[in-house]
């Protein structure tokens, strides 16, 4: 299975966020702008982190914001948000975060497949710093291994 679609509208470079909630909200807005999710999906992603802690910070500098499949998800989609200034999520080892991925999937099977595919992308130690430094949507897609 390939990564979920990554529309140009879902790539936000140099976003300003004062805290992790604003960073996650930026990822949710990018998913909404791409048509993958409703704006309320950002609230669901934030709620998951409030309930379960900073488990979404999956590697140094990288958060994978997501929520359960539900009515807020319109179709599978991915968002990439780089932050002008990194923010802390409260993770003991992987803060601060400079790249927030937003993941919206319609079912649990797609969720597992998407996470596995993303893990393959980030097996490359250079991927996170490269994304954080990216200046164009095409550059982000190249780093993510998505055909242009």
Question: What kind of region is each of these model predictions?
Answer:
Residues 1-148:
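Cytosolic covalent-transfer regions centered on His/Cys nucleophiles
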